[in-house]
Each structure stands twice: as structure tokens, then as C-alpha cells.
A protein has these predicted regions:
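Glycine-rich phosphate-binding loop plus the immediately following alpha-helix
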Residues: 62-105, 190
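Conserved phosphate-binding catalytic cores of ATP/NTP-utilizing and phosphoryl-transfer enzymes
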Residues: 14-50, 55-62, 147, 151
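Adenine-nucleotide phosphate-binding core of ATP-dependent small-molecule kinases
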Residues: 117-150, 189-192
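N-terminal glycine/serine-rich phosphate-binding loop of ATP-dependent small-molecule kinases
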Residues: 1-29, 173-184
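Phosphate/pyrophosphate-binding loops at sites that engage ATP/ADP/AMP, CoA/4′-phosphopantetheine
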Residues: 1-7, 146-157
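Glycine-rich phosphate-binding loops at beta-strand->alpha-helix junctions
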Residues: 14-15, 150, 155-178, 186-192
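Active-site nucleophile and cofactor-binding loops and adjacent substrate-binding regions
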Residues: 24-33, 47-51, 69-77, 136-139, ...
Length: 194
């Protein structure tokens, strides 16, 4: 597509304020709401686990944003947390879900701070705890963190998960269990907010 073929531009995300040539700027929150509601009009709660932040968004029956909460101050509960855990566990990020699902028990990871959680994981591994059990604990800790956030806006089914975190089956399972509602994954969840 050449510049002459572009009729209208919309920017979103963290960099939206830095691009000056757009016709319109829309927040990530609104984009997630529009994208999810377009594909599933029964969606009422969106959980977005992205690389930099995690969001929980409550939708009205018309798809409007009723409330939201966002964790953008630290990496806890985000895709970055998953990346750090995968690195410490010496596991490719794409295999972290499978490793966690092989866990026979969920080893508690009590630190919400990524830096401290990393140290806690290293301690568990040094004590002989299996990688799979530690991975299960890391996934469970994210689900617990997100459930706490969701409690602040209220969870109403249908729950839809977006962002790259939605590609982690173990996280989807843990979150479904923690929220007490099935979590639905729509096509291309990692680009839903675009």
C-alpha cells in the first residue's frame, strides 16, 4: 500500500501520542472493546495480557466500556513476567504453557514483583523443585494477580482474553479456574486491540 492509497489513519497504543500524522487517536481500552465486541457481542469482560501491561475491561450490553483497571506500573501479571519466568526456567516462551501443564503440583510464587519472583523461582529450583511445578506456580500467580484486578471492576461472563498471554493455554486454564468462569479466546487475540 502506498501513501496515496491510505484514506484514513487511526493510531492506538503507547505510541499514539507521538505520531502526528494520524486522523484520529483511540485508546487501547476502546480498541479492545470494539475489537472484542465486533467478534463476540456477548462479551462482558475482557482480560488483556500484553507484554507491557494487563487490563481488565467491563463492557455494557452495547459494547461500551463501563469500567476498567490497568496494571501498567510493573511487569507483574504481564507478558514480560512470562518472558522472565521462561528465561529463568530455561524454557522457550512458546513451551512455557506445556511445561506448566506437566506440573504435578502448583508451587506458590508469593512475590508479585517480577524481580523478587525471579529470585523466588531460582530458590525453588535450587531446592530441587521441578521446573514443571515451578512453571505451574508462576502461571497460577499471574492468574491470581489478574483475578484481583478483575474483582475491582466486576467479572461478568462472557470473559474474553486478548493479548499474547491468551496464547498460553495454561494461563487460560488457570484464569478460568481462578475467575470461576470459562475464558474464551477469539481469533488472533494478540492483535485484538489494534
Amino acid at each position: 500500500i502506498g501513501p496515496e492509497e491510505v484514506r484514513y489513519t487511526v493510531v492506538t497504543g503507547y505510541g499514539r501520542m507521538t505520531y502526528q500524522g494520524a486522523d484520529r487517536q483511540i485508546t487501547e481500552i476502546s480498541c479492545h472493546a470494539k475489537g472484542v465486541f465486533h467478534l463476540s457481542s456477548s462479551a462482558r469482560t475482557i482480560v488483556d495480557v500484553g507484554g507491557q501491561d494487563t487490563k481488565v475491561i467491563r463492557l455494557g450490553q452495547d459494547g461500551s466500556v463501563e469500567n476498567f483497571v490497568m496494571n501498567d506500573k510493573c511487569a507483574a501479571g504481564t507478558g514480560r513476567f512470562l518472558e522472565v519466568m521462561a528465561r529463568v526456567l530455561d524454557c522457550p516462551i512458546a513451551s512455557l504453557s506445556q511445561l506448566a501443564q506437566q506440573g504435578e503440583e502448583v508451587v506458590p510464587i508469593s512475590n508479585l514483583c517480577t524481580v523478587f519472583a525471579e529470585s523466588e523461582v531460582i530458590s525453588h529450583l535450587s531446592a530441587g523443585v521441578s521446573q514443571a511445578n515451578v512453571a505451574a506456580g508462576a502461571i497460577a500467580s499471574i492468574a491470581t494477580r489478574i483475578t484481583g484486578m478483575a474483582g475491582r471492576v466486576g467479572v461478568e461472563p462472557q470473559v474474553v482474553m486478548t493479548g499474547g498471554g491468551a496464547l498460553n493455554g495454561a494461563l487460560v486454564e488457570a484464569l478460568s479456574k481462578s475467575l470461576g468462569h470459562p475464558v474464551c479466546i477469539l481469533d488472533n487475540p494478540q492483535v485484538m486491540g489494534a
